Amino acid sequence: MPTTYATLAPPAILFAHRGARAHAPENTLEAFRLAVRLGATGLESDVWRTADGDAVLDHDGVVGTMFRRRRLAEVATADLPGHIPSLAALYEACGVDHDVSLDVKDADAIDAVLDAARAAGALGRLW
């Protein structure tokens, strides 16, 4: 029987890209909660800033139909479709016991991202 040795390496992070998007609409609280329930130890999303300064999670950064599309930076958080969560809502729904990797698509979102992570006590697990 081979000898096994303890490792100093931390365990791998199992990131759920846009949540459990194979089983729930991507980048929704439903998808992120499901990913955590299925064993993800990390959550990943793109992040944008709204007109009123909130960090929100969405892939495309636009809302609306073909002829009425608007960038998230032009829309207040309260006017967004219900399926687009804020980063603060992600922390409320899923807790802070996992890593969060954010692809910052809008440089103006950085302060809002840091504020939300800091308020949740999750700054140390933010990628």
Question: Where do the model's predicted regions map?
Answer:
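Catalytic beta/alpha-barrel core
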Residues: 79-83, 99-109, 117-127
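An active-site metal/cofactor-coordinating segment within enzyme catalytic domains
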Residues: 4-14, 41-42, 47-99, 105
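Active-site mouth loops of central-metabolism enzymes
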Residues: 16-26
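Short, acidic/polar
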Residues: 24-34, 84-87
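Feature marks short, surface-exposed loop/turn motifs that line or immediately flank catalytic pockets
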Residues: 22, 51, 108
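A general structural detector for well-ordered alpha-helical segments in enzyme core domains, enriched
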Residues: 31, 86-90, 109-116
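Alpha-helical structural signal in soluble globular domains
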Residues: 38, 93, 112-120
